[in-house]
Design a protein with these regions (language model features):
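Amphipathic alpha-helical segments enriched in hydrophobic/aromatic residues interleaved with Lys/Arg
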Residues: 100-151
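N-terminal regulatory/effector-sensing and dimerization cores
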Residues: 4-105, 134-137
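An acidic intrinsically disordered interaction segment
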Residues: 1-9, 112-117
Length: 151
């Protein structure tokens, strides 16, 4: 199977969603201006971030903050597939303030771990991704995103 990328952007929120598959070298070190929340669907996704080498397997969630330099490769011949959401900081701040009545002045999250083994978070991430990527009804997308942010 060769490399492929399926990119979409939500017209209402600006959230970008990417589902991709890579074999071998995936991408060189780079960073994003947005928060990334994604889940590995298939294979082993190996990447370096925050000076640590990570190996994400199906069901694991990866969490990157704006400016986190990371790379990517598939250490096994079947490659890896992942789904990820790119959340703009301004949008995320607005949503967290709407969800949590007593949110502090700067309510943007800080991820203690880049790779997470939380089944509930993985399910919420996958559901939010699918509703945004498949452009479900606005109320369905908003509910799924609220559930993800509440994790």
């Amino acid at each position: 199977m060769s490399n492929w990328i399926d990119f979409k952007q939500d017209a209402d929120t600006g959230i970008e969603s990417v589902r991709a598959h890579f074999v071998g070298h995936a991408y060189d070190p780079h960073w994003h201006d947005s928060f990334l929340v994604g889940v590995t669907e298939q294979g082993v996704q190996q990447f370096n971030c925050r000076r640590v080498r990570h190996r994400s397997t199906p069901g694991q969630v990866f969490l990157l903050e704006p400016g986190d330099i990371h790379d990517g490769l598939a250490p096994t011949e079947e490659g890896f597939t992942y789904s990820t959401l790119y959340l703009e900081p301004a949008w995320l701040d607005q949503q967290l303030r709407a969800l949590f009545e007593h949110a502090p002045g700067d309510s943007l999250p800080s991820f203690a771990d880049t790779l997470c083994h939380d089944a509930r978070l993985a399910r919420a991430t996958a559901l939010a991704f699918h509703t945004v990527h498949n452009q479900d009804f606005r109320i369905v997308r908003q509910t799924a995103m609220d559930d993800l942010l509440a994790c």
